[in-house]
């Protein structure tokens, strides 16, 4: 899980979702998981 100021999809399988007011990227590849912080 990477925490960064701006989250971007890295590959075509990355999905941007909102959870508890935070923007997150979820993906099949665990390296692509990101959270805005």
Curated annotation (Swiss-Prot):
Give the transmembrane ranges: none
BP terms from Gene Ontology: translation
The protein's matches in PROSITE patterns, at most eight in alphabetical order, are given as: RIBOSOMAL_L36 (PS00828)
* GO terms, molecular function: structural constituent of ribosome
> Which InterPro entries does the entry link to?
Ribosomal_bL36, Ribosomal_bL36_sp
A Pfam entry, by short name: Ribosomal_L36
- A single cellular component GO annotation: cytoplasm
Query: Which keywords does the record carry?
Result: Ribonucleoprotein, Ribosomal protein
Write out the similarity annotation: Belongs to the bacterial ribosomal protein bL36 family.
| HAMAP family tied to this protein | Ribosomal_bL36
Q: What is this protein called?
A: Large ribosomal subunit protein bL36
Q: Which organism is it from?
A: Desulforamulus reducens (strain ATCC BAA-1160 / DSM 100696 / MI-1) (Desulfotomaculum reducens)
Whichever gene encodes this chain, its name is: rpmJ
